[in-house]
């Protein structure tokens, strides 16, 4: 047994537990125990002193990120996947692991039924090829097609659909166990039945690309909607006379709030305010598109042109479409804006696990894990935040 000292655990903003800890490691390098420093000395129950593996000097430890909204990368768009893309998909998953991401919910934006089902079949095959050191494919995130036309953003109008059980079955029949989330507009006629069916299937339902007002959002939350997709974007804004879905979600306190922390989708001030208003609800997502991992410039997105500049993706008409930034870049930016490192890390590494019921807290996410699979976060004297493999 070895022990690492002076380690910090990320926690939500305002959580008083973010102080320095011991980490106990097995001979194989797995974390076997975590305890606050000062509560016990550096010895085991027989009084034998544990070998000291060194001090981390207040650095943070975390699992790798979980990205619940990522649309592709390295030139692959998940809704366009075909069987011959499998090798490139595995390459992308390896790339994501090297970018600090443990698992993703591959996001399938609004598209035709046949391409959607074809993409889910490719993802099913890829899941069987998972191995250590490769980003894991969770269930898919279906973002559409049951979206409000007035809030569709970059989603193609021709593939939007009215919600119904028949339309749902046509799209997901046979793949029900391989879907983690679905984003929809709950105010649409027929959405209530779809929400109920998704909940029966243990699929998390998110409100997004929606024109719902606060009262409509409240009804949706009562019916089981548990998340907002890219908060602030493609929904009514947060206003002092019209709180909208975001205001209602913050009031309740139990709705996850997906946040794109690139500084373009949401102004840094609003991102920090959201974190302060709803510290345990904020979940950092990338919303990365197919050009993630590629250079800025002109790229293709289905039949459209995607213009990428400094990590921001727009259609030719200027419509904001997504980013090409890694998820953990959002951690660095939110930490810089807020001057709160631990909460920013928590929002990308622990909070997403709660949404899809992988684990409920930081210690649960760390105990039993190989140190080499985890991340160590260091803030230098200039305030810059960096991460590296923990071992």
For the regions a protein language model found, what residue spans apply to each?
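Divalent metal-dependent hydrolysis catalytic cores, especially in the metallo-beta-lactamase
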Residues: 71-74, 79, 90-119, 135-148, ...
């Amino acid at each position: 047994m070895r022990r690492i000292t002076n380690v910090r655990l990320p926690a939500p903003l305002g959580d008083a537990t973010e102080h320095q800890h011991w980490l106990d490691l097995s001979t194989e390098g797995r974390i076997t125990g975590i305890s606050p420093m000062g509560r016990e000395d550096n010895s085991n129950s027989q009084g034998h002193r544990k070998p000291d593996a060194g001090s981390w000097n207040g650095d943070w430890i975390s699992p790798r990120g979980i990205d619940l909204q990522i649309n592709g990368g390295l030139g692959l768009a998940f809704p366009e996947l075909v069987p011959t893309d499998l090798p490139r998909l595995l390459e992308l998953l390896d790339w994501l692991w090297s970018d600090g991401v443990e698992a993703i919910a591959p996001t399938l934006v609004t598209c035709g039924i046949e391409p959607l089902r074809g993409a889910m079949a490719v993802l099913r095959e890829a899941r069987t090829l998972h191995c250590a050191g490769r980003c894991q494919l969770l269930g898919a995130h279906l973002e559409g097609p049951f979206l409000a036309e007035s809030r569709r953003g970059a989603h193609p109008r021709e593939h939007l659909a009215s919600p119904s059980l028949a339309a749902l079955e046509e799209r997901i029949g046979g793949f029900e166990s391989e879907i983690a989330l679905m984003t929809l507009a709950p105010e649409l006629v027929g959405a209530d039945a779809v929400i109920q069916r998704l909940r029966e299937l243990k699929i998390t339902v998110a409100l997004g690309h929606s024109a719902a007002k606060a009262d409509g959002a409240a009804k949706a939350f009562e019916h089981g909607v548990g998340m907002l997709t890219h908060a602030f974007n493609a929904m009514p804004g947060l206003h002092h006379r019209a709180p909208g879905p975001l205001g209602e979600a913050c009031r309740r306190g139990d709705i996850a709030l997906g946040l794109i922390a690139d500084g373009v989708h949401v102004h840094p001030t609003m991102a920090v305010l959201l974190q302060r208003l709803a510290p345990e609800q904020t979940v950092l997502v990338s919303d990365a598109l197919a050009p993630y991992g590629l250079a800025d410039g002109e790229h293709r997105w289905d039949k459209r042109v995607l213009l990428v500049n400094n990590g921001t993706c727009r259609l030719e008409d200027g419509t904001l479409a997504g980013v090409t930034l890694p998820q953990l870049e959002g951690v660095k930016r939110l930490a810089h804006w807020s001057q709160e490192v631990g909460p920013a890390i928590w929002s990308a590494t622990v909070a997403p696990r709660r949404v899809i019921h992988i684990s409920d807290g930081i210690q649960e996410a760390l105990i039993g894990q190989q140190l080499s699979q985890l991340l160590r976060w260091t803030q230098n004297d200039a305030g810059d935040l960096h991460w590296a493999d923990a071992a």
